[in-house]
Design a protein with these regions (language model features):
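Walker B catalytic acidic pair
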Residues: 213-214
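Acidic, Ser/Thr-rich intrinsically disordered and amphipathic helical segments
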Residues: 40-41, 53, 65, 92
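Phosphate-binding P-loop
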Residues: 33-34, 42-51, 73-76
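Walker A/P-loop
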Residues: 49-69
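Short, conserved phosphate/pyrophosphate- and ester-handling motifs at nucleotide-, phospho-/glycolipid
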Residues: 38, 58, 62, 86
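Alpha-helical nucleic-acid-binding subdomain
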Residues: 67-208, 218
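Pre-ATPase regulatory/linker segments immediately N-terminal to the P-loop/RecA-like helicase/translocase core
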Residues: 1-43, 99, 117-140, 144
Length: 218
């Protein structure tokens, strides 16, 4: 990663071990439903300024610890991003958060999302938005006018072009509105690491990123 004198450079050097990670001094939070090791790990995550790594043998509750850290972080931050190497891992975390009432927006191919999380995918939420029927109607009108333009006179075609231009502008406004509503209402944006490069996430910034199965991505 070619970066110098910025936050990306700091994170790169921290992950490579050439820069010591920073931690805040916070009063420990108690989690009676976790064991002492898990509780310590969650608090370490909450204190991290740069990066915190939770590691351990299989079956020790690392993902459970991660879910708790995410939930607690949402008491401090308006929105976080959650990623994992596999769709199964992303869905498992999302299910646990949804069960706690956390609004989740799942980014990725809906055909690879489990049935329980399907209603939380971007595509399904987009189609269920109150403004979607108007957008669908506009798109239908544009398609129909496109078909009629080939048969109309010059004056009719010019009139339809003008109307289609206005409809396209309105469609763009609705798409922007729906996207803003979906992202603004979600507390957790979730995707696989591959899908985190999705165009919908271009330009978006998150105070904290959680990655499950991080070692599998190396």
């Amino acid at each position: 990663i070619r970066a110098k004198g910025n936050r990306l450079a700091e994170l790169r050097d921290t992950l490579l071990g050439t820069l010591k990670p920073g931690f805040r001094e916070l009063y420990p939070v108690r989690f009676p439903w976790l064991n002492s090791t898990q509780e310590t790990a969650v608090n370490k995550v909450l204190c991290a300024r740069d990066v915190s790594i939770v590691h351990g043998p299989p079956g020790t509750g690392k993902t459970t610890t991660l879910v708790e850290a995410i939930y607690e972080t949402l008491h401090r931050e308006p929105q976080v991003m959650v990623c994992a190497q596999s769709n199964t891992a992303v869905d498992w975390i999302c299910e646990k958060l949804v069960d706690r009432g956390v609004p989740v927006l799942r980014i990725g191919n809906p055909t690879r999302v489990n049935d329980k999380m399907l209603s939380f995918t971007y595509e399904r939420r987009f189609e269920n938005h109150p403004a979607y029927p108007e957008l669908w109607g506009i798109r239908k009108s544009i398609r129909e006018m496109g078909g009629r333009m080939r048969r109309g006179s010059y004056e009719e075609r010019e009139g339809m072009r003008s109307r289609m231009s206005r409809l396209r502008d309105r469609a763009t406004e609705l798409e922007i509105q729906i996207n803003a509503d979906l992202f603004d209402s979600a507390r957790v944006i979730a995707s696989t690491l591959v899908s985190s490069n999705h165009r919908l996430l271009n330009g978006r910034r998150f105070p904290t990123l959680f990655i499950d199965e991080a070692a599998q991505a190396l």
